[in-house]
């Protein structure tokens, strides 16, 4: 078998096949062939390098090259650009031709070597399933691709193609992409990562370059190969019956490597939530990270000690974004009893009921409130001018860090007086919210649910503590709207004065929950909890509240909850 890695060059002012060099340590992790294979060969080609791509490839080959029967290494270290390119990510005709020639060279080598199969894989395609090759080979199909997930609706296959070789929308795409139908399906095109069987007469006629003599479609490597398959009568399939891995959404021609790096970081974060996560290879050195607090005095992460997986995921996400944070052990509602609550001075706000289920306060909600309250106390005690507070179930939107930094810079420039800014929440009446003049990314916050992510000023923390909320407690996400006087229940508001918290919200939002009620992985330590004054230890799953449902008013940046722009080859 011949195993081909198409490693694109990357970094700084690199040209042609460019990917940020931080992709490579992750790409290399699972590129190990099944031990059952008798012989294998690894091949790699890079060009247009001005960063450490070549060094990283050589480092990886030095560690694992002995595992392969043959290693073919081709490197062109001279950096160069194409005369008519608009930017480092612009695919010119010359670039497409160069890529097709390299693919053809790899295909010819595989045939000469007597290989049974050849696997092509782009460096921004991450195979997290180490059984991918075995699963594809067992299908016994001439050309087959593992369906890869991405941050948007983009994937590595087309369900339809026009007679002129352009993309055609079909009714089958979304059910396939979303795995509403599972299996292996015949499609007109696969690209980026796919396996080609070299054991049939039909596939012997396949070629990347030169194009077929009758070829009149667009000059693009993936379309040229799709036409070659069609002309040779070779069926093409995509399989989505397993989670195989991920692919990064491409950037626009005028954008550069920094934007692609940002996209890839977001892909890593999505994989941490949805799984399986991407693991960096031990055989490749990763570029160093320099985490900071983004100009805040502190970044807090509230996390229960008995939820280590959620904590680890959150810290990994922040690390990938180079955000330095401190974990605050959340107060566990399961450890609370009446005597502890009495000692803390905790009492229920008279008349409080959940707005949907009608239940009373739960111990989980008490623990959540006390966790946030302890941070407010620390902010005041240490005189911290501004902080960020995260809960440990945050799904970050694309380019979270830069967007937050830009938002805070704009707030400072406009000299906005603020106490609290929601970064993630569930809006109840978004149509009533007013945009802040001079700050297009900010609105005056209305009644909202959730406290999964927000910024807080010293003045805001002082106002929250001054209201003495422990003596008349309600859930923290109900308390905050009371304090900025936007809660619809006047009886609740009557217990607090003044209600002058200056609260705003990012729009579009920068964060959302990792999961919602009804999702397979959803869990809640506030909804699955005993009533606040019940010491029996019984856990009740409260299903009546709609706060944790996936609501229509999230107002994230994209219709799917993601803010990345569709790729030209995207379904959208």
UniProtKB/Swiss-Prot annotation:
Q: What keywords is this UniProt entry annotated with?
A: Cell adhesion, Endoplasmic reticulum, Glycoprotein
Q: State the compartments where it is located.
A: Endoplasmic reticulum lumen
Q: Would you list which residues are glycosylated?
A: 52, 130, 214, 337
Which regions form coiled coils?
Answer: none
InterPro entries linked: Collagen_mod_GT25, Glyco_trans_25, Nucleotide-diphossugar_trans
Question: Where is it mostly found?
Answer: endoplasmic reticulum
Q: What SUPFAM superfamilies does the record point to?
A: Nucleotide-diphospho-sugar transferases
An individual GO BP term: cell adhesion
Q: Which Pfam families match?
A: Glyco_transf_25
* One cellular-component annotation, GO: endoplasmic reticulum lumen
Originating gene: Cercam
- Which residue numbers does the motif Prevents secretion from ER cover? 569-572
For whether the record's keyword set contains Endoplasmic reticulum, the answer is: yes
Q: What does the protein in this record do?
A: Probable cell adhesion protein involved in leukocyte transmigration across the blood-brain barrier. Does not express any beta-galactosyltransferase activity in vitro.
Does the keyword field hold Lyase? no
CDD domains registered for this protein in UniProt: Glyco_transf_25
What would be an example GO MF term here?
Answer: identical protein binding
What is stated as this protein's family in its record? Belongs to the glycosyltransferase 25 family.
Name this protein carries in UniProt: Probable inactive glycosyltransferase 25 family member 3
């Amino acid at each position: 078998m011949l195993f081909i890695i198409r490693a694109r060059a990357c970094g700084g002012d690199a040209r042609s096949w460019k990917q940020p060099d931080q992709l490579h340590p992750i790409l290399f992790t699972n590129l190990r062939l099944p031990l059952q294979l008798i012989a294998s060969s690894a091949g790699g080609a890079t060009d247009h390098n001005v960063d450490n791509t070549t060094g990283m490839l050589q480092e990886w080959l030095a560690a694992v090259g002995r595992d392969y029967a043959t290693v073919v290494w081709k490197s062109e270290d001279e950096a160069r650009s194409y005369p008519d390119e608009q930017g480092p990510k612009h695919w010119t005709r010359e670039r497409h031709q160069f890529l097709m020639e390299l693919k053809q060279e790899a295909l010819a080598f595989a045939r000469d070597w007597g290989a049974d199969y050849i696997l092509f894989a782009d460096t921004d395609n991450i195979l997290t399933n180490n059984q991918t090759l075995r699963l594809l080979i067992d299908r016994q199909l001439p050309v087959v691709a593992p369906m890869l997930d991405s941050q948007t609706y983009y994937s590595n296959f087309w369900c339809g193609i026009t007679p002129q070789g352009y993309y055609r929308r079909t009714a089958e795409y979304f059910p396939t992409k979303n795995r509403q139908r599972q299996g292996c399906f015949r499609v007109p095109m696969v690209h980026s990562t796919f396996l080609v069987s070299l054991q049939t007469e039909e596939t012997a006629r396949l070629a990347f370059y030169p194009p077929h003599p009758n070829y009149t479609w667009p000059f693009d490597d993936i379309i040229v190969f799709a036409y070659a398959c069609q002309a040779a009568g070779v069926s093409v399939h995509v399989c989505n019956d397993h989670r195989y891995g991920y692919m990064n959404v491409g950037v626009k021609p005028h954008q550069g490597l920094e934007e692609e790096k940002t996209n890839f970081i977001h892909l890593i974060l999505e994989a941490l939530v949805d799984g399986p996560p991407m693991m960096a290879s031990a055989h490749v050195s990763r570029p160093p990270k320099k985490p900071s607090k983004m100009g805040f005095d502190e970044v807090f992460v509230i996390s229960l000690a008995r939820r280590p997986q959620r904590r680890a995921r959150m810290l990994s996400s922040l690390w990938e974004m180079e955000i330095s944070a401190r974990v605050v052990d959340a107060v566990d509602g399961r450890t609370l009893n009446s005597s502890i609550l009495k000692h803390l001075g905790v009492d229920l706000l008279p008349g409080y009921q959940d707005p949907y289920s009608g239940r009373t306060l739960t111990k989980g909600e008490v623990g959540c409130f006390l966790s946030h309250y302890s941070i407010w106390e620390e902010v005041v005690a240490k005189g911290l001018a501004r902080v960020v507070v995260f809960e440990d179930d945050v799904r970050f939107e694309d380019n979270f860090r830069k967007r937050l930094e830009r938002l805070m810079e704009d707030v400072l420039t406009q000299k906005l007086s603020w106490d609290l800014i929601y970064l993630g929440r569930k809006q109840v009446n978004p149509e009533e919210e007013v945009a802040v003049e001079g700050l297009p990314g900010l609105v005056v916050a209305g009644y909202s649910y959730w406290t999964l992510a927000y910024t807080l000023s010293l003045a805001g923390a002082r106002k929250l503590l001054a209201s003495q909320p422990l003596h008349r407690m309600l859930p923290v996400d109900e308390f905050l709207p009371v304090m900025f006087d936007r809660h619809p229940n006047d009886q609740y508001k009557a217990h607090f004065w003044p209600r002058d918290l200056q609260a705003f919200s990012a729009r579009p939002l920068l964060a959302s929950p990792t999961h919602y009620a009804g999702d397979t992985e959803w869990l809640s330590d506030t909804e699955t909890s005993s009533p606040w004054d019940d010491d029996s230890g019984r856990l009740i799953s409260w299903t009546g509240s709609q706060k944790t449902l996936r609501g229509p008013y999230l107002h994230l940046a994209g219709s799917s909850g993601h803010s990345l722009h569709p790729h030209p080859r995207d379904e959208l």
